[in-house]
């Protein structure tokens, strides 16, 4: 299983290994070599049908569920290094039916220490389908792969001087994740 990521504002994609997938809300203990954590909020989908070079008019046939999550990046390093740290792809389950995205009142929110640091409505279905098509140009999509689209630029989340932070996320007023980053 791959986690295929489309960086914010880019047409290209890269893959994260499945060892980065965190689905149990476990706290992240920062390795000694990492002094800062960066992050990006994402919308993601699970691929439900294998495909290669998917035509945009058929993209909706290749996924059956969606959700929102968080990607963490270790330090301000190259993507290949910073995106491979274990438990840094916070892509929660269960996933929602794509129809939920059509209601713009459903909000995805991320909180750091109880303060909102990101909030968005959910009208991104076209971006999701475009990302599936672009990802399938570079790699063969398999059932179970995740396609994640960054919803903003990567930005600083926490530094070693903070000691510990709590990060929470919700969608449709339901809790998606709640964990700490501990330095």
Language-model regions, residue ranges each:
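Catalytic-core "active-site belt" of small-molecule-metabolizing enzymes
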Residues: 1-146, 153-183
């Amino acid at each position: 299983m791959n986690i295929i990521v489309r960086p914010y504002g880019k047409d290209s994609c890269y893959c994260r290994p499945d060892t980065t997938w965190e689905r149990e809300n476990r706290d992240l203990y920062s390795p000694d070599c990492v002094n800062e954590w960066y992050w990006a909020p994402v919308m993601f989908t699970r691929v439900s049908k294998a495909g290669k070079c998917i035509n945009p008019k058929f993209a909706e046939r290749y996924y059956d569920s969606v959700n929102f999550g968080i990607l963490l990046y270790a330090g301000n390093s190259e993507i290949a290094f910073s995106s491979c740290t274990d438990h840094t792809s916070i892509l929660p389950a269960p996933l929602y039916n794509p129809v939920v995205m059509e209601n713009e009142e459903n909000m995805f929110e991320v909180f750091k220490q109880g303060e909102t640091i990101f909030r968005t409505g959910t009208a991104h279905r076209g971006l999701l389908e475009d990302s599936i098509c672009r990802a399938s140009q570079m790699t063969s999509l398999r059932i179970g792969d995740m396609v994640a689209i960054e919803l903003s630029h990567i930005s600083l989340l926490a530094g070693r001087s903070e000691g510990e932070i709590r990060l929470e996320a919700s969608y449709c007023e339901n809790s998606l994740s709640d964990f700490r980053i501990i330095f």
